[in-house]
Amino acid sequence: MRVFNTLTRQKEEFIPIITGEVKMYVCGPTVYNFFHIGNGRTFIVFDTIRRYLEYRGYKVRFVQNFTDIDDKMINKANDEGITVKELGDKYIKEYYQDADSLKIERATVNPRATEYIHDIIKFVEELIEAGFAYEVDGDVYYSTKKFDNYGRLVGQNLDDLQVGARISVDERKKDPMDFAVWKAQKPGEPAWESPWGPGRPGWHIECSCMAKKLLGDTIDIHAGGMDLRFPHHENEIAQSEALTGKTFANYWLHAAFVNVDNKKMSKSLNNFFTAREVLEEYSSDAIRFLMLSGHYRIQINFTKELLDSAKSSIERLYNCINNLENLKDEVTKKLMDEAEEKYLKSLDKYREKFIEKMDDDFNTADAISVLFDLTKDINNNVNINSSSELCEKAESMVRELGNPLGILQDRIEKDLETEIQELIEKRQQARKNKDFALADKIRDDLKSRNIILEDTPQGVRWKKID
């Protein structure tokens, strides 16, 4: 397996610290609002990578944090007239609802920054003792010039970064690029007691501390959105490696943006759609399909047309599953014969191809193409003359390859199936009664819902089409 490491800017063979195990940290949301579909892509991408690692046999310890104290949260809590903790509790609950709806698996641990204040204070104290941080009027800053490799993640030296960075001017800092690891309390802000007076942690120190506490000094994979490379991830490296003297993360993975009209989707531009809004119109399968239809390091556009296309594509894949489900109930032969066993064995090439694509830096776009090739093969070769065992095993393979992508796991909608069966029986009765107008109306109504009826020797069958 090869992964693209942002740190080295090249693909590298993936070798975990402990054979068969992966320690993975993903920067999670700041819980002051519903997350938008751009954030959703990041969560879906790294959920998919986690799923695939598990599919390949790795035991994954997956940590994704909640930032539950920062300026945005303080301002939003004040606007709503509630405490910062109440705001965090509210939107963590909303996050889980939307993430569950998107089939994003729960993390092994979802730490909240406010649960690790004691550890963060200790971390800051040790940075000061090591000479990498200094206190000014209750604030504590990290001294970037003390860390030789600062800028390595984004491939720039400190001077170049200073020229291009948007940095807050504070004459108390020794260098403009120095950043806060502890912030002195301002009026009306929540605070915790510390050796430097009441205050709260800086954003970057939270992730460094929680990653170290939950995963150790060195982790296998650290991941997040492309916008976090600098300054957030750069600062995490500086803090963590200054303290431990060890490599913080062996592999850095970053997911590209989602664009609307070729501009990055963001709350600041007010061009975003929340995941919940999109889920009202589209299934999690369709949304995940769109988000994974391009390589995770390549930006994708978000449009209704592309979502509709993703919906149609997912329906094509489910059509194969639905046909196999119907065939299982209709075929008379139960067990596979020798020819069917040979055919089933021939399908292994799709599994091998799927793994080959995903092993190449998690190329979901090409892996999805393999799924379409598999279902096309099955549609052309599994029919009413096949055994129920072959139908079962073919369906199992389609679902198996869909699982790492978080798609094709739903069962046939029984309510829909029952409704259609009732309409078919009503149509049959209308034809017996020579009420052809009613029979045609039922057929046309179903057709308008992309449901086609087929007359077979075993009776009327239905299937969904694009």
Curated annotation (Swiss-Prot):
Residues that coordinate or bind Zn(2+): 27, 207, 232, 236
Biological process annotations from GO: cysteinyl-tRNA aminoacylation
Keywords: Aminoacyl-tRNA synthetase, ATP-binding, Cytoplasm, Ligase, Metal-binding, Nucleotide-binding, Protein biosynthesis, Zinc
Record text on cofactor binding: Binds 1 zinc ion per subunit.
Top-rank lineage group of the source organism: Bacteria
Coiled-coil boundaries: none
Binding sites annotated in the UniProt record for ATP: 267
EC number(s) per entry: 6.1.1.16
Motif position, 'KMSKS' region: 264-268
Compartment list: Cytoplasm
Keyword Nucleotide-binding assigned: yes
Catalytic activity: tRNA(Cys) + L-cysteine + ATP = L-cysteinyl-tRNA(Cys) + AMP + diphosphate
Oligomer and partners: Monomer.
Database matches in NCBIfam families: cysS (TIGR00435)
Record PANTHER family: CYSTEINE--TRNA LIGASE, CYTOPLASMIC, CYSTEINYL-TRNA SYNTHETASE
Protein name, entry field: Cysteine--tRNA ligase
Native organism: Clostridium beijerinckii (strain ATCC 51743 / NCIMB 8052) (Clostridium acetobutylicum)
Gene: cysS
